[in-house]
Design a protein with these regions (language model features):
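A generic structural signal for residues embedded in beta-strands
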Residues: 44-45, 60
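Catalytic cysteine-centered active-site loop
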Residues: 1-37
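Aromatic- and glycine-rich peptidoglycan recognition patches
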Residues: 21-24, 29-32, 53-99
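A conserved glycine-rich beta-strand in the N-terminal activation segment of trypsin-fold
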Residues: 49-50
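Structural motif
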Residues: 40-41
Length: 99
């Protein structure tokens, strides 16, 4: 699922992360503007999380595609908003233990 994908991706980068998207919501530092997003940043919705491939593309496991999908962030935001509401947080993980 989405949070396991993020947990595994962060682990590959040396960042220890919780298993669920709720606790993952507190990883790293807050990003105030989506124009600042870069590879490895996290995008959160209520009950969902994805990781940025680059400044404009989101990688996430989702029920819409029933797979891990790579899609433009704007498309993901618009589609997910219908089900889960707006983005709740943008975070930049830091290489430190977060548990």
């Amino acid at each position: 699922d989405c949070s396991a994908l993020v947990q595994l991706a962060l682990a590959a980068g040396g960042i220890d992360a919780p298993r669920d998207s709720g606790p993952q919501h507190h990883i790293g530092s807050r990003i105030d503007d989506s124009s600042q997003l870069q590879r490895g940043d996290l995008v959160f919705w209520h009950g969902h999380v994805g990781i940025m491939q680059d400044g404009k593309t989101l990688l996430h496991a989702n029920a819409h595609h029933m797979a891990v999908a790579s899609e433009p962030l704007g498309d993901a935001i618009a589609r997910i908003a219908i089900i889960a509401g707006p983005v709740t947080a943008l975070r930049r993980p830091m290489p430190e233990r977060v548990r």
